[in-house]
Amino acid sequence: MSGLTIFSDQQPEKPLWQSHDAEEIQQQLTAIGVRFERWQADCELGENPQPEAVIAAYQHEIDRLVAENGYKSWDVISMRPDNPQREALREKFLSEHTHGEDEVRFFVEGSGLFCLHLNEKVYQILCEKNDLLSVPADIPHWFDMGSAPNFTAIRVFDNPEGWIARSTGDNIADGYPRLA
């Protein structure tokens, strides 16, 4: 079940607000300029989905995002618990960073934890299957895929080469709850 937990950026041990209600999550995130929607990810992809099959299955949704926002490219990220690079990739995404473009993800399988740092707060968004999340450019954030990652998400980009992360140098992510 999708969820949102909001913390002060000074007190990671004490949540200020928490919900698993999609409408409440959407209201909180819309207030800070972040798009959160529940779409339908109802295509069976199998155990190890190939990127081409995922894109073909959800081309209509990709076309919708491109038409709405002018995105230029897209790809698929799929991570499984047996991926030999999972620990290194998890560490890479756990560092707070920004992008010069929106970070758009449509989860078609599994889950991941997006953490946004703005307005002296940390917003932890547990994204699950059917969740579309669009984080505007330049918002500091990090992503936790967990120690046994299991998700497939479509990523949509402004830049045809994909996103380029810029580290903030802040170690704030180290103090907040992570996925198991």
Curated annotation (Swiss-Prot):
Domain of life: Bacteria
UniProt cofactor(s): Fe(2+); Ni(2+)
A family per Pfam: ARD
UniProt-annotated binding residues for Fe(2+): H97, H99, E103, H141
Enzyme Commission number(s) of this protein: 1.13.11.54, 1.13.11.53
An MF annotation (GO) of this entry: nickel cation binding
A Gene Ontology biological process term: L-methionine salvage from methylthioadenosine
UniProt keyword terms in alphabetical order: Amino-acid biosynthesis, Dioxygenase, Iron, Metal-binding, Methionine biosynthesis, Nickel, Oxidoreductase
SUPFAM superfamilies the record matches: RmlC-like cupins
Cofactor info, note text: Binds 1 Fe(2+) cation per monomer. Binds 1 nickel ion per monomer.
Binding site for Ni(2+): H97, H99, E103, H141
InterPro entries xref list: ARD, ARD_bac, RmlC-like_jellyroll, RmlC_Cupin_sf
Pathway(s) it belongs to: Amino-acid biosynthesis; L-methionine biosynthesis via salvage pathway; L-methionine from S-methyl-5-thio-alpha-D-ribose 1-phosphate: step 5/6
Site entry (May play a role in metal incorporation in vivo), positions: E96
Reactions performed catalytically: 1,2-dihydroxy-5-(methylsulfanyl)pent-1-en-3-one + O2 = 3-(methylsulfanyl)propanoate + CO + formate + 2 H(+); 1,2-dihydroxy-5-(methylsulfanyl)pent-1-en-3-one + O2 = 4-methylsulfanyl-2-oxobutanoate + formate + 2 H(+)
Residues with site note (Important to generate the dianion): R105
Subunit structure: Monomer.
HAMAP family for the chain: Salvage_MtnD
Family indicated by similarity: Belongs to the acireductone dioxygenase (ARD) family.
Reported function: Catalyzes 2 different reactions between oxygen and the acireductone 1,2-dihydroxy-3-keto-5-methylthiopentene (DHK-MTPene) depending upon the metal bound in the active site. Fe-containing acireductone dioxygenase (Fe-ARD) produces formate and 2-keto-4-methylthiobutyrate (KMTB), the alpha-ketoacid precursor of methionine in the methionine recycle pathway. Ni-containing acireductone dioxygenase (Ni-ARD) produces methylthiopropionate, carbon monoxide and formate, and does not lie on the methionine recycle pathway.
Name of this chain's protein: Acireductone dioxygenase
Annotated source species: Yersinia pseudotuberculosis serotype O:3 (strain YPIII)
Gene name of this polypeptide: mtnD
